[in-house]
Amino acid sequence: MKKILVSACLLGENVRYNAEVVEVSDSIKALSEKYEIVPVCPEVLGGLEVPREACEIQGLSGADAIDGRCAVLGNKGTDCTAAFVSGAQKSLELAREHDVEFAVLKERSPSCGSTTIYTGKFDGTKHPGEGVAAALLRRNGIKVISEEQL
């Protein structure tokens, strides 16, 4: 069976920044009938705890953080950039280890957002962009889609 990477929070795992568990959607359940699911939470892989500060990228996209052009900051001012980049690298290693077909990642997440992320102002505004892990996966040829595109 072919494998896909899926954000662990979309699978009902307790990994979200606020420790809220999200119910597994029917579209995610349907994927498990066609693919072997490889769960991933880049933020936890990078060493961040649950719960943790809400974080936002202080640049246009996750690629900026990967390339050292901006930081990923928590809402209390903590610089979480190294954890986000490390988690993205470990997510890429996991994707390669399992030879995944593609990744389904959580939209608007500073790690996993694939088309939209928060602006970095912590005021709820969003703009086009991708999270750190989504950017690194794409940079390495892995297709990334949002759960909202299923």
Which stretches of residues belong to each language-model region?
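Extreme N-terminal starter segment of soluble prokaryotic enzymes
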Residues: 1-4
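Divalent-metal-activated hydrolytic enzyme cores
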Residues: 14-17, 33, 45, 63-94, ...
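Short, surface-exposed acidic-centric catalytic microdomains
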Residues: 22-72
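Internal, conserved structured core segments that host functional sites
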Residues: 104-117, 121
